[in-house]
C-alpha cells in the first residue's frame, strides 16, 4: 500500500499530528494493558514470543473492529457532513465494550486527549465533542478524537489508521517492556514486525461497514473482565 501523507497536509500540520501519536504524549495510555496483564498473571504470556502472539490477536480483533474501524467510519461520516453519525459510533463502541475497566479507561484517555489537543489547537468539532461528554450525551473515545483531529488537518483515512495503529502498538510494547519485562531491543523488534500486520489491517478495514463495529474475541474480553478482580497489578485495566 502506497501512501503520500503530505499530499494534502503541510509539514507543520504533519508534525503536529506526529506529536499526538507519540507514545510520550501524556494521555494516560501507559496506565492500561487492556487485559494483557491478566495473561501475565496466568502465565499465558511470559516472554517476547507470548506477548507478540497476544498483540497480534489484539490488533486483529479489538483494534481492527474497534478503534481502527471507527476511524474509517468517522471519515465516511465527515465526508458526508453527518456529524450525528459520529456521536452514534461513540455510543456503539462504548456500550459494546464488555469490561468495565476497559470501558472506563478508554473514556479517561479520550477526555485527557481532548483536553490536551484543545489546549494546543482549539478545533471547533472537538469543542462540540468535549461539550457532549460533559453533558453526558457522549462517552468519549480516543480513536474518534484522533479521527476528528486529523480529518480537520487534511490527513487521508489510511494514513490516519496507520498512524493511530502505530501509536497503539508503540504504547503497548512499552507497557510490555515494563511488565513482563521485555528488553528494549526485543520490544523494538516486535514493533518493526507489527508493521506488516498493520498495513494489511489498514487495507482490510476499508472493506468493512458499521455492522462490524465493536466485534471482539471472547478471550480478550474475558481477560479484561478478570483483570478487574486481579489483586496484584501494575495497570488500571
UniProtKB/Swiss-Prot annotation:
Localization terms from the record: Cytoplasm
Coiled-coil regions listed: none
Domain of life where this protein originates: Bacteria
Keywords: Chaperone, Cytoplasm, Nickel insertion
Keyword Cytoplasm carried by entry: yes
First-listed, main subcellular location of the protein, grouped into a coarse class: cytoplasm
Disulfide bond positions: none
GO molecular function, one term: nickel cation binding
Pfam families hit by this protein: UreF (PF01730)
PANTHER family assigned to the protein according to its UniProt record, in alphabetical order: UREASE ACCESSORY PROTEIN F
Family: Belongs to the UreF family.
Subunit annotation: UreD, UreF and UreG form a complex that acts as a GTP-hydrolysis-dependent molecular chaperone, activating the urease apoprotein by helping to assemble the nickel containing metallocenter of UreC. The UreE protein probably delivers the nickel.
Protein name: Urease accessory protein UreF
Source organism of the structure: Streptococcus thermophilus (strain ATCC BAA-250 / LMG 18311)
Name of the encoding gene: ureF
